[in-house]
Amino acid sequence: CALENGKHTAIEVPSAMNLEQCWSLIDLAEKTRLHCFILENCCYDDYEMNALAMAQDGVFGEIIRAEGAYIHSLEWFWDAYWKDPADNDVDNLHWRLKYNKENRGDLYATHGLGPVAQCLDIHRGDRFTTLVAMDTDPFFGKELVKEKTGKECKEFRNGDHTTTLMRTAQGKVVEIQHNVMTPQPYNRLYKLTGTKGYASKYPTKSYALSSEAMKGTGAPKIDNLNAHGFMNEEQKTALEKKYYHPLQRKYGEFGRNMGHGGMDYVMEARLVYCLQNGLPLDMDVYDMAEWCCLAELGTLSMDNNCAAVTFPDFTRGYWNKVEGYKHAYAPAEQEAKAEAAAKAYTAAQKKVTADFNLWSLYDAIKTAKNPKAAQKKYDKAVVKAEKAMAKALAQK
């Protein structure tokens, strides 16, 4: 385990699938005093970040309700998922369809939950207390297995569409949906309902504000404007320009053509930035647990006639010690120093890698007649490269 070996750790979503795994990661992170980061890229999408900036400035008033989802027809992807030879996949379903067949609940909650949890200051003044989940029967799921195996599917645990309702300690409500079965456009919902306005990302990125809330947003004044209709394009553009998130300004445009419209790059750049500058991460191990535990808690609810289930307090009582969700930033001088050191390190690493032919030596191990000798040659080159790199950095 990386944490047990002294390494800060980032885990792909969903990072934990049950309460035992959630608590195990928390206990280990606390024991080692190391970061455990959930790689939830949807928290860094442009609309979510801009809406977060608006929410933090009170544009929507008090956020009282939020919605998120992972609605994504996987029709074209089921057979592309890994087939684990040790998973007893006798029906050749590949891991993801097999997991849906064997497990009930929201199995992929964090894309929808993460961004709205930040807007609601979860673990920074509020926490989830109660959950109720409900699902449809697996109409599509059973037919899908029958189509792939040629046999009647008698047991399919996960419903085609799962809905989870959660209430917070401060009286807010969040609704999260999961559907990877039925044919419909991709949708993460992302809706914020506030006392002064409303934000909705799908099917089109929209905002609706009360006439009072419109004042001071920078949006052009329109007579008789109210929240019965969405803002027009001119107003929306002006609002988004004013609340264009600093992280999008710093990283977004550079990463625009990278993974998932740039949000992967922003997430990774932000993780590195926080580690380089010794800052709290945007998402910690407690967020990871809170967002991932829906899988098992939802199952408990649905397996007991959709009964209410109590959330564990993963923070051990510290959920209201920090006031409001915020991104941490280093002073400009420290930030510049850290960036310069990182660039120097990267340049030195690239130089010694080329000087000592490390990539070629590494690749040669796979095709070598004597792999042990090739590995030994590579290891010796790495030692020399590390010494040369240390010397180069010491001269900076």
Model region roles, listed by residue range:
Residues H35, C42-F156, L271, N305:
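Predominantly a Rossmann-like dinucleotide-binding segment in NAD(P)-dependent oxidoreductases
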Residues T110-H111, E155-D160, T168-A169, P183-Q184:
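A short catalytic or substrate-binding loop motif that flags glycine-/basic-rich loops and adjacent residues
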Residues T164-Q170, G194:
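Active-site beta-strand termini and strand-to-loop segments that position acidic
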Residues C1-Y44, G58:
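Beta-strand-loop-alpha-helix segment that lines the small-molecule cofactor/substrate pocket
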Residues L25, A51, L297:
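Aromatic/hydrophobic pocket-lining residues that form π-stacking "cages" and hydrophobic walls in ligand
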Residues K7, L34-H35, E62-I64, K172-V174:
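Short, well-ordered coil/turn segments that N-cap beta-strands
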Residues A117, P185-T193, S200-P203, S210-K396:
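C-terminal helical cap and adjacent loop that interface with cofactors, partners, or active-site loops
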Residues L74-W76, T182-P185:
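Short glycine/serine/proline-enriched coil/turn segments at secondary-structure junctions
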